[in-house]
Amino acid sequence: MVLSAADKGNVKTVFGKIGGHAEEYGAETLQRMFQTFPQTKTYFPHFDLQPGSAQIKAHGKKVAAALVEAANHIDDIAGALSKLSDLHAQKLRVDPVNFKFLGHCFLVVLAIHHPSLLTPEVHASMDKFLCAVATVLTAKYR
């Protein structure tokens, strides 16, 4: 999916606004995904999946860092997330649909915390961006 200049601007604006909350939102996104799509828990059998657990927060921080990295390198998401793509495809073997679930949950978290920011145009841009991230993360599954 090709991101237009307007899409790229919208994505950068969103990440600029969420700034210091990215880690918090990453953990909240994971927690929401585990609750809404319980099958995703199978990849975390060693985690304490209770809300607010240190493991959820730590992994949420990694999720947030990857999304920020992708946003910071929006013209080369594949390059920015290449190692992460390798990890998920070759070692972790995460079901590709989980990346779509994660993107959906991230949009919900954004909508909860920043309802006025998520206009229809920004929502569409973020959805395209998150789909692009999911596509990159699943590209090496073939």
Swiss-Prot record:
In what residue span(s) does the Globin domain sit?
2-142
**GO cellular component terms given for this protein:** blood microparticle; haptoglobin-hemoglobin complex; hemoglobin complex
Q: What does this protein do?
A: Involved in oxygen transport from the lung to the various peripheral tissues.
Q: Which family does it belong to?
A: Belongs to the globin family.
Assembly and interaction partners: Heterotetramer of two alpha chains and two beta chains.
On tissue specificity, the annotation reads: Red blood cells.
Keyword annotations for this protein? Heme, Iron, Metal-binding, Oxygen transport, Transport
For the biological process aspect of GO, one term held by this record is: hydrogen peroxide catabolic process
* PANTHER family found in the cross-reference section: HEMOGLOBIN FAMILY MEMBER, HEMOGLOBIN SUBUNIT ALPHA
Species this protein is from:
Anseranas semipalmata (Magpie goose)
The UniProt GO MF terms for this protein read: haptoglobin binding; heme binding; iron ion binding; organic acid binding; oxygen binding; oxygen carrier activity; peroxidase activity
Q: Which InterPro entries match?
A: Globin, Globin-like_sf, Globin/Proto, Hemoglobin_a-typ, Hemoglobin_oxygen_transport, Hemoglobin_pi
Q: What is this protein called?
A: Hemoglobin subunit alpha-A
Q: Which domain of life is it from?
A: Eukaryota
Residues that bind heme b? 88
Per UniProt, where does O2 bind? 59
